[in-house]
């Protein structure tokens, strides 16, 4: 192990090379915006496969278009966006088919970094412990087979904003949490609805940089068609 290189930091200490990582948050807090922002940054160095199960290609195009100034954000060539149409996949061996499609797309596009938005489409039974555990085992096998780095977007049930984010806020089984190498979450400030914060919940590589005493503070802005989280400081959760 000592002879192998240390895993590279893919994005601000939140996700490291070779990890299966999870980003979770409540609805409408900007999970996909943050994930695309990560993909945009990483794709300037290497290919990134972004599996989008949330937006159509037109919705995605409009999200990154400044209508007033007629400016479209230009993503790096290394960012490859793909869509999964769940209606085109048989419910027999649904999860196996999804994983095979992801594997094939990653190989064809020469992408070792994969972002999957979101967990609901990947695993029909993600809230059922046994099925979720089996699915994550298959995903871990895929990671080990190709040395992929995989980020999975997930939901959290409605939560009290005054309470700190914990692993218990991740929707689904505890088994899901145990399989992830690292986990971080997006929360909304209960003092200012316009602000978001990012907190690390689980770390295996690196260190806890952004715990409850030092969360990343952001506001969501659009600059020349690029909708993104703009870092404005640090704070206690």
Question: What are the language-model segments listed below?
Answer:
Residues 2-9, 164-167:
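Short gly/ser/thr-rich secondary-structure transition/capping motifs
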Residues 41-42:
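Residues immediately C-terminal to the Walker A/P-loop in P-loop NTPase nucleotide-binding domains
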Residues 22-23, 28, 33, 45-47, ...:
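Phosphate-binding/switch region of NTP-binding enzymes
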Residues 5-6, 10-12, 16, 46-134, ...:
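Conserved inter-motif catalytic segment of the P-loop NTP-binding fold
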Residues 228-231:
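C-terminal regulatory/interaction module of P-loop NTP-utilizing enzymes
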Residues 34, 38:
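Hydrophobic positions on the alpha1 helix immediately C-terminal to the Walker A/P-loop
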């Amino acid at each position: 192990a000592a002879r192998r290189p240390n895993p590279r930091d893919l994005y601000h200490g939140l996700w490291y090379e070779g990890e299966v990582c999870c980003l979770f948050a409540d609805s409408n807090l900007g999970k996909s915006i943050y994930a695309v922002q990560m993909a945009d940054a990483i794709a300037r160095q290497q290919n990134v496969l972004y599996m989008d199960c949330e937006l159509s290609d037109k919705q995605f195009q409009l999200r990154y278009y400044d209508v007033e100034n007629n400016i479209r954000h230009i993503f790096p060539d290394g960012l490859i966006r793909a869509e999964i149409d769940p209606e085109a996949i048989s419910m027999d061996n649904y999860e196996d088919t999804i994983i095979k499609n992801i594997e094939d797309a990653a190989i064809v596009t020469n992408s070792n970094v994969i972002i999957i938005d979101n967990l609901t489409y990947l695993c029909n039974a993600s809230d059922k412990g046994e099925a979720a555990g089996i699915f994550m085992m298959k995903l871990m096998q895929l990671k080990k087979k190709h040395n992929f780095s995989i980020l999975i977007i997930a939901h959290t049930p409605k939560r009290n904003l005054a309470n700190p984010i914990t692993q218990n806020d991740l929707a689904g089984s505890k088994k899901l949490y145990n399989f992830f190498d690292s986990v971080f979450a997006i929360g909304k400030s209960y003092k200012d609805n316009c602000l978001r914060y990012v907190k690390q919940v689980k770390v295996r590589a690196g260190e806890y940089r952004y715990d409850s005493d030092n969360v990343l503070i952001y506001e969501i802005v659009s600059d020349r068609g690029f909708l993104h989280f703009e870092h404005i400081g640090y704070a206690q959760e």
